[in-house]
Design a protein with these regions (language model features):
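Core FKBP-type peptidyl-prolyl cis-trans isomerase
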Residues: 62-65, 123
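A generic structural signal for short beta-strands and their flanking turns/coil linkers
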Residues: 20, 28, 84-91, 124-128
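HotDog/MaoC-like acyl-thioester-processing domains
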Residues: 1-12, 99-150
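Hydrophobic beta-strand-centered segment that forms part of the acyl-chain substrate-binding groove
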Residues: 53-56, 66-111
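Generic structural detector for well-ordered beta-strands
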Residues: 18-23, 94, 146-148
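Catalytic strand-loop segment that frames the active site of acyl-thioester-processing enzymes
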Residues: 2-59, 73-74
Length: 150
């Protein structure tokens, strides 16, 4: 049995956190389109989107999710980062509001469930409610993320 502290053991249902903010930039949208191959006019055609219900181009939903996971990673301590064994997945993903170039997002989380694991790598899984909010305090993305921790 290890005497090292366990991040999993210290994680409790109801734990909450809020990350710092991050502004979604023109470069983010352009680079994400290139990396993902998603050149949909929603993200790339300013003239077309100016006449749409959104009034301007919107950021890719998965770009916002990716930026949110980055903010969550940056918010972890070195010990918490070392304790991450695997990212298991995302459930109940919803895009609540559009995110525009220039919007600043932050992530709010609450631990919903911890589940011990008897075998294999890691001590257990943590299921977390995740809400991405913009500078107007609107929820733009919501989901549940599950992570395997030591």
């Amino acid at each position: 049995m290890s005497d090292e502290p366990s991040v999993f053991a210290d994680t409790e249902e109801g734990d909450t956190a809020v990350t710092q903010g991050r502004t979604i930039t023109e470069a983010d949208v352009t680079n994400f389109a290139g990396v993902s191959g998603d050149f949909n006019h929603l993200h790339t055609d300013a003239e077309h989107m100016g006449e749409s219900m959104f009034g301007e181009r919107i950021a890719h939903g998965m770009l916002v999710v990716s930026a949110a996971t980055g903010l969550l990673w940056q918010a972890r301590s070195p010990e918490e980062r070392e304790a991450v064994v695997a990212f298991y997945g995302i459930d109940d993903l919803r895009f609540r509001q559009p995110t525009y170039v220039g919007d600043t997002i932050r992530v709010e989380t609450e631990v919903l469930e911890t589940r011990s694991k008897d075998e294999g790598p890691g001590n257990g899984t943590v299921r977390t409610a995740v809400e991405v909010r913009n500078q107007r305090d609107q929820a733009v993305v919501s989901c549940e993320m599950t992570t395997l921790l030591r």
